[in-house]
């Protein structure tokens, strides 16, 4: 395929057009009075959302050069979403502001490499300032405030804070669609680990690509199962009970896996196999945790146990097990409360004794899975369109809340970014590096300008007043009042704010130092078939 190439200002200008199209679409959603965007779907009803990354992913432009610019900004939104789970619109606004001002200076003759260094230096300094401003989050009310600001809904804030209070900040919180119109919170005890099914033919729900097992037996072993004969006596016992089986093993391969899959497809036997979580000694400990939670025994040679001799008494049990391609969740294990509490006490003692931060983190994860649970937020709405929009809102709120617990909170509404400008005033560089710093200084004001504009206020007026206010005081765009943002509950997670700035500065610097852009030339449309000559007869017809 032949290529189309553009150089220097032509290339950057074409990409800037794409950046503007995407950013102008996304930034209308920013702030408490931001609007929604309607996305056409190839099937089903349109999606109405104000989620920046969802909108960015949908945008495809006809011009290849413009589309590359749009996709680079979409990458900023996606990266911010992956790291912090929220703040994608802020990241998009910051990227547009940095690139726009940077291109003006590059076009005027500035060195793009020097500007990029200045942008990176300013971003590092501002991020350090944001981290210093961060206030730790522990209590339920602060968690509710973060979720409320992210979702623009007090009810959603209550659901998220209740869920985190009941399962802990490290607990598992999932979001499902409710069959009714009311949104509800359901908390059940359970354990989740990062291993999915070994074959997609084991799924029972093809729409969600999930395997669901009700009241399953659970075979837990550290052995590799390659020969079906090893577990055949056990399978025959389970078959008589007409209950499903979840196999958690080192691996299932050889003839064993296709035999299990074939029986599953034929409807003879409902079975799902997953690999055991973790590695080495940590795997042994996690399998033991799972056995205690489900009331089973780890079948291992270390205890003198063999798969051929295993009976139903050695198997764990649970009310439900759900397995997707990446995760396994076991709900309401049949283990005794005393055994579980004893295990929890042992893990807590290990946490106190360990001197390794990594080991401590892994032990805390095990503790959360064993002592915590699974909280399910069941989202209800009047229509499918509203339901999809609500799910996206709650997912963003949940991610923002986790980010807040992890790194603390800062003043919301873009106030923290403007407050971070003071740290940039201490930087003194020369030439194009200083120009890059000034570009970031101006860009840090842009989220506040956009929030104000979306609420019907003049952004420049708000920024002028904000510069003279005390640190932490900001503009509440919902009410039009100047308030202490933290006291008013208008807060953003520090992780979200700094991730948005870091990712925006990174991609903006790359765009500014671009000197050539190579794109595929559009293929010429195939010529239409010429009309048939009416004088020509139809062969074989009278």
UniProtKB/Swiss-Prot annotation:
Q: Which Gene3D superfamilies match?
A: GroEL (3.50.7.10), GroEL-like equatorial domain (1.10.560.10), TCP-1-like chaperonin intermediate domain (3.30.260.10)
Residues that, per the record, bind ATP: 29-32, 86-90, 413, 476-478, 492
Q: What class of enzyme is it?
A: isomerase
Q: How does it assemble?
A: Forms a cylinder of 14 subunits composed of two heptameric rings stacked back-to-back. Interacts with the co-chaperonin GroES.
Is ATP-binding found in the keyword set? yes
What terms describe the molecular function in GO for this protein?
A: ATP binding; ATP-dependent protein folding chaperone; isomerase activity; mannan binding; unfolded protein binding
Q: Which GO terms describe its cellular component?
A: cell surface; cytoplasm
According to the UniProt entry, what is the EC number of this protein?
5.6.1.7
Family listed: Belongs to the chaperonin (HSP60) family.
The protein depicted here goes by the name Chaperonin GroEL
Catalytic activity reads: ATP + H2O + a folded polypeptide = ADP + phosphate + an unfolded polypeptide
Tell me which domain of life the UniProt entry assigns to the organism this sequence originates from: Bacteria
GO biological process: what's one of them? Answer: protein refolding
| Coiled coil region boundaries | none
Q: Which UniProt keywords apply?
A: ATP-binding, Chaperone, Cytoplasm, Isomerase, Nucleotide-binding
Name the CDD domains on file: GroEL
**What is known about what this protein does?**
Together with its co-chaperonin GroES, plays an essential role in assisting protein folding. The GroEL-GroES system forms a nano-cage that allows encapsulation of the non-native substrate proteins and provides a physical environment optimized to promote and accelerate protein folding.
Places the protein is found: Cytoplasm
């Amino acid at each position: 395929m032949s290529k189309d190439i553009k150089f220097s200002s032509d290339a950057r200008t074409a990409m800037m057009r794409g950046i503007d199209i995407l950013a102008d679409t996304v930034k209308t959603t920013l702030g408490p009075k931001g609007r929604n965007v309607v996305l056409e779907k190839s099937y089903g009803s349109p999606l109405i959302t104000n989620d920046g990354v969802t909108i960015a992913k949908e945008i495809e432009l006809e011009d290849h050069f413009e589309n590359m610019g749009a996709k680079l900004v979409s990458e900023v939104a996606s990266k911010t979403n992956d790291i912090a789970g929220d703040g994608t619109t802020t990241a998009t606004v910051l990227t547009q502001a940095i690139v726009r001002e940077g291109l003006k200076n590059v076009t005027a003759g500035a060195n793009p490499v020097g500007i990029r260094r200045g942008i990176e230096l300013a971003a590092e300094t501002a991020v350090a300032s944001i981290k210093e401003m961060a206030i730790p989050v522990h209590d339920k009310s602060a968690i509710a405030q973060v979720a409320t600001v992210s979702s623009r809904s007090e009810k959603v804030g209550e659901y998220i804070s209740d869920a985190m209070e009941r399962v802990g900040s490290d607990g598992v919180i999932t979001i499902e669609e409710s069959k009714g119109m009311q949104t509800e919170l359901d908390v059940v005890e359970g354990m989740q680990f990062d291993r999915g099914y070994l074959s997609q033919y084991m799924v029972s729900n093809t729409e969600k690509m999930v395997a669901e097992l009700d009241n399953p037996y659970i075979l837990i072993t550290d052995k590799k199962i390659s020969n079906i004969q090893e577990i055949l006596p056990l399978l025959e016992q389970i078959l008589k009970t007409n209950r499903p089986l979840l196999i958690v093993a080192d691996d299932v391969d050889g003839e064993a896996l296709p035999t299990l899959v074939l029986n599953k497809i034929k409807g003879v036997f409902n079975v799902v196999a997953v690999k055991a979580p973790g590695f080495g000694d940590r795997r042994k400990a996690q399998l033991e945790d799972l056995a205690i939670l489900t009331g089973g025994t780890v079948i291992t040679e270390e205890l003198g146990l063999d798969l051929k001799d295993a009976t139903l008494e050695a198997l764990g049990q649970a009310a439900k097990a759900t397995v997707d391609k990446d995760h396994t969740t076991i709900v309401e294990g049949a283990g005794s409360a005393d055994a579980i509490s004893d295990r929890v006490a042992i893990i807590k003692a290990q946490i106190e004794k360990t001197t390794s931060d990594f080991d401590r983190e892994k032990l805390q994860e095990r503790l959360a899975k064993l002592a915590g649970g699974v909280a399910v937020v069941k989202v209800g709405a009047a229509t499918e369109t509203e339901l999809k929009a609500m799910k996206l809102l709650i997912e963003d709120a949940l991610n923002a809340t986790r980010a807040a617990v992890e790194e603390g909170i800062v003043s919301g509404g873009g106030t923290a970014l403007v407050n971070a400008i003071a740290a940039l005033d201490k930087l003194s560089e020369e030439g194009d590096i200083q120009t890059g710093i000034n570009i970031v200084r101006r860009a840090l004001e842009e989220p506040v300008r956009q929030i104000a504009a979306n609420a019907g206020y003049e952004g420049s007026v708000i920024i002028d007043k904000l510069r003279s206010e005390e640190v932490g005081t900001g503009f509440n765009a919902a009410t039009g009042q100047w308030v202490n943002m933290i006291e008013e509950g208008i807060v953003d997670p520090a992780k979200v704010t700094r991730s948005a700035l870091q990712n925006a500065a990174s991609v903006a610097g790359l765009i500014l130092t671009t000197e050539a852009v190579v794109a595929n030339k559009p293929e010429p449309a195939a010529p239409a078939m010429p009309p048939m000559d009416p004088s020509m007869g139809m062969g074989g017809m009278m």
